[in-house]
């Protein structure tokens, strides 16, 4: 049997149309299954229909309009799909063994759930709608510019290799590791509850937060970008450059470098910092109920310890500016 497929389309009559890669086909009257090397190009899925792609089947340039699903699994590939479902009802669903490449979400949903084996999403862009990365999701070069990403549902590991957060909110948790992320103006990256982000940067005005159980290691913030360590969250090995900031709201900061024009502020009780290098024209603030230790303050760098704050094992180089308010405490190394 040829891999050219004929679809039945009916609305009061019957019409046959070859899916030949040249003409778009509307999937209104029935679902379609692509497998065993079958290929479909330019289909439009709507009205509750479904396009199933598996076992070496391939769907290219599918548009999912209105209420419709594109389901990819077990060796199937979907590429260059556009999901723009009415009232957020269109969906791209990538299951175990499935791969979706260069797909765009205008509205609707993307779910990637690979249990019991990997499901793969590559070079996808989400402008809106909810996105979920669940068990065994394997994602690379993902961009979110609107809507919400939740990466962490299910007990299996989730891996994201490269992400741009240009808007919207990305939540990383539940045994999910994010390697390499850039958070831009209007974007928020939250890491919590077993999630980890490695080398997440906020070069402009993005926001990166470590919440309870979340770890952020490596990365940098400049411009108006900033990090926040909430209670139970940890920032490790970050670098702050001019205009960049980090805030301790009950969480911890370790191994950080505070560069010229940058600020590290321990503001809420319970915040702590360890192994901090404050470079020329950088600032470290230690407020009431907060503590810092193993601090190196360079020439023309600034350490301010307020009433109720504590700084231990401080190395103050010649020309450093160290200010301890009444009720503050400092010990030099």
Protein language model annotation of sequence segments:
Residues 329-333:
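Short, intrinsically disordered, charge-balanced linker/junction segments flanking boundaries
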């Amino acid at each position: 049997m040829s891999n050219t497929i004929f679809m039945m389309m009916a609305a009061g009559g019957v019409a046959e149309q070859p899916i030949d890669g040249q003409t778009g086909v509307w999937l209104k009257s029935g679902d379609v299954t692509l497998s065993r090397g079958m290929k479909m190009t330019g289909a439009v899925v709507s009205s509750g229909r479904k396009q199933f792609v598996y076992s070496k089947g391939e769907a290219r340039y599918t548009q999912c309009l209105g209420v419709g699903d594109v389901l990819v699994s077990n060796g199937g590939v979907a590429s260059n799909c556009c999901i723009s479902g009415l009232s957020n009802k269109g969906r791209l669903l990538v299951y175990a063994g499935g791969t979706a490449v260069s797909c765009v979400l205008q509205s609707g949903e993307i779910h990637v759930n690979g249990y019991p084996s990997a499901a793969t999403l590559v070079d996808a862009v989400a402008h809106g709608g909810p996105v979920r990365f669940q068990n065994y999701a394997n994602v690379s070069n993902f961009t979110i510019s609107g809507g919400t990403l939740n990466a962490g549902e299910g007990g299996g590991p989730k891996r994201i290799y490269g992400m741009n957060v240009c808007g919207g909110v990305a939540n990383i948790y539940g045994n999910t590791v994010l390697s390499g992320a850039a958070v831009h103006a209007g974007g928020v990256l939250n890491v919590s509850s077993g999630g980890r982000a490695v080398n997440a940067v906020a070069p402009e005005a993005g926001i990166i937060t470590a919440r309870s159980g979340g770890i952020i290691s490596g990365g940098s913030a400049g411009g108006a970008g900033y990090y926040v360590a909430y209670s139970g969250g940890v920032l490790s090995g970050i670098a702050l450059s001019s205009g960049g900031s980090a805030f301790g709201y009950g969480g911890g900061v370790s191994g950080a470098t505070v560069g010229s024009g940058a600020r590290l502020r321990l503001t809420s009780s319970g915040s702590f910092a360890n192994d901090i290098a404050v470079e020329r024209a950088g600032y470290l603030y230690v407020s009431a109920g907060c503590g810092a230790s193993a601090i190196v303050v360079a020439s023309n760098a600034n350490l301010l310890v307020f009433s109720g704050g504590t700084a231990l094992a401080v190395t103050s180089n010649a020309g450093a500016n160290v200010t301890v308010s009444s009720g503050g405490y400092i010990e030099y190394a």
